Regions:
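Structural motif
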Residues: 14-16, 43-45, 74
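Anionic group-transfer/hydrolysis microenvironments
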Residues: 18-19, 49, 78
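Short glycine/serine/threonine-rich phosphate/pyrophosphate-binding segments
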Residues: 23-25, 52-55
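Inter-motif core of Ras-like GTPase G domains
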Residues: 26-49
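Short gly/pro/ser/thr-enriched loop/turn and capping motifs at secondary-structure boundaries
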Residues: 50-53, 106
């Protein structure tokens, strides 16, 4: 883990943890272990599809259990749909929720800048 902190003196650092908090990143380490070590605010990215609410809430619960700060949940909209995942998540959590879609980059960037 110390290799991740070596010579980092930037004002903004982004570390991607693919697969979820409890996905392995090494033989005896999970993404959550890296997150705990680095103590950076989390941006939880969830694909906007059926099951997104459950995935987001479970990840938020795991972050809370491990005393990790979550800056926001990002719903990644690959395809237009009639789901109301953003509205549902806003109702279930106090964590900010933003959406990202191919055509809405400027709006997304302005929302994210306020949160991180």
């Amino acid at each position: 883990m110390s290799a991740c902190k070596h010579d980092v003196d930037e004002s903004f650092v982004l570390v991607e943890g693919a697969g979820g908090l409890y996905s392995p990143i090494a033989e005896a380490a999970l993404n959550v272990d890296l997150a705990i070590e680095l103590q950076l605010p989390l941006l939880i990215v969830i694909r906007d599809e059926l099951g997104a609410i459950s995935q987001a809430l479970l990840t938020l619960e795991a972050a809370k259990k491990n005393n990790l700060k979550v800056a926001c949940v990002i719903l990644n909209v690959f395809e237009s749909n009639n789901l109301s995942n953003k509205e549902a998540l806003v109702a279930y959590t106090k964590t900010p929720v933003v959406s990202f879609s191919q055509g809405g980059l400027e709006v997304f960037c302005s929302e994210i800048e306020k949160l991180v």
